[in-house]
Amino acid sequence: FGVNVKEKIRSLKENIDVLTLTATPIPRTLQYSLMSARDLSIINTPPSNRVPIQSEVIRFDNNLIRDSIRFEIERGGQIFFVHNRIDNISEFGIWLQELVPNAKIKIAHSKIEGKKLEKIMLEFINNEFDILLSTTIIESGLDVPNANTIFINNAQNFGLSDLHQMRGRVGRSNKNAFCYFITPPLSSITDDAKKRIAAINQYSELGSGFNISMKDLEIRGAGDILGGEQSGFINDIGFETYQKILSEAVNELKNSEFKRLFKDDQIDESTTEET
C-alpha cells in the first residue's frame, strides 16, 4: 500500500488510534517508530514447534535444483518455485518438467483468470500436485504446511521485504524447511543487491523480521517522513549520522525547546510579582 492509502484512515476521524501489523515494516514506517513518533512492539516469539528455515544462496545449478526437488517430493512434501517473469514462465515450466519428469507442476500468475487461479491454489493447498511455479503472487496470504522447499529465481532483483515474505511461505510446520536464493555470480550484481542477499542469508532465524527491516532501512534510507516517499537514500551523510541528526532534532522539539520556554515564563512571572 502507498502512503496515501495507509494515511487515508486519518482523514476519516481526528485523533483516531491506529494499530499497524507487519512482518517487515517499510523504511518510512520503521523510521516513525525509531524517532518515537509511533510506539513499537516486537513479537519475537514464533509459533510453537517451528524450526528455522535453512537458507542458501546458490547459482543456477540443474543438479542441485533437481536433487532438492526430489528430496522434498520423496518425503511427501511440496515445492514453491518463484519465477517472476510472466512472459516466459511457460517456457520455464517446460524446462522444470524436463528436469523432474515425474513431478506434477502447475503455474500461477496474475494474468490467469480469477476462478482458475483460485482452483490452482486450492489444489496446491490440498496436495494435489507437487510444484507450484509462480510469480510473487504467493508472497503473502498462503499457508501450506506441507510445502517446505522454495526456490526464488533471480533473487537479486527483489527487495528484502519481498525475499523475507517469500521465504516465509515455507517452514510453517515442524518439518525442516529449505529456501534457495538463486542469483548470478555476485560479481555481476549491484552493490545494494549484494547487501540484500547477504542480509537475507544472515538473518534466517525465527523472528528476524525486525533485523531485516533495520537492514532495509540502512540500505534504502528512511524516505520522506513528512511526504509520500517510502524509501530514500542517505548515502551522502551515512546512516548513523542521519539517525543522530534526526534524533537530536526530535528531542529538541519534544523537550529542550518547550522546557526552556516554560522556564522563561516562570522567571518572568516571579520577576513581575516582586516588582
What residue spans do the PLM features occupy?
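C-terminal helicase module of SF1/SF2 nucleic-acid helicases/translocases
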Residues: 20, 62-80, 84, 88-275
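Post-DEXD/H (motif II) to motif III coupling segment of the RecA-like Helicase ATP-binding lobe
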Residues: 1-78
